[in-house]
């Protein structure tokens, strides 16, 4: 990475936890509903919302539960790099 490329990457990086939280609310789903499907407690869900990045396996599970391809966000960043 050059410094300029790194700066572009950082500006474009998303806070995946916030995006997941917004999608959950958009679907009008509760944190309890989400926690049950993730097989964790609500505290863990709130911890996910605070995370800027997530393990890919967890992100895949979340994508399946919410029927939303969160990986597309990263693909778009990759495809739009200069």
Label each residue range with its predicted role.
Residues 3, 29, 54-57:
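Residue-level signal for the short linker/turn that defines the boundary of a DNA-recognition helix
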């Amino acid at each position: 990475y050059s410094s300029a490329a790194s700066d572009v990457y950082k500006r474009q990086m998303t806070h995946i936890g916030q995006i997941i939280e917004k999608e959950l609310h958009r679907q009008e789903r509760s944190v309890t509903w989400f926690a049950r499907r993730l097989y964790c407690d609500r505290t863990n869900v709130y911890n996910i919302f605070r995370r800027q990045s997530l393990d890919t396996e967890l992100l895949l599970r979340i994508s399946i539960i919410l029927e939303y391809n969160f990986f597309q966000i990263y693909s778009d960043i990759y495809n739009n790099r200069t």
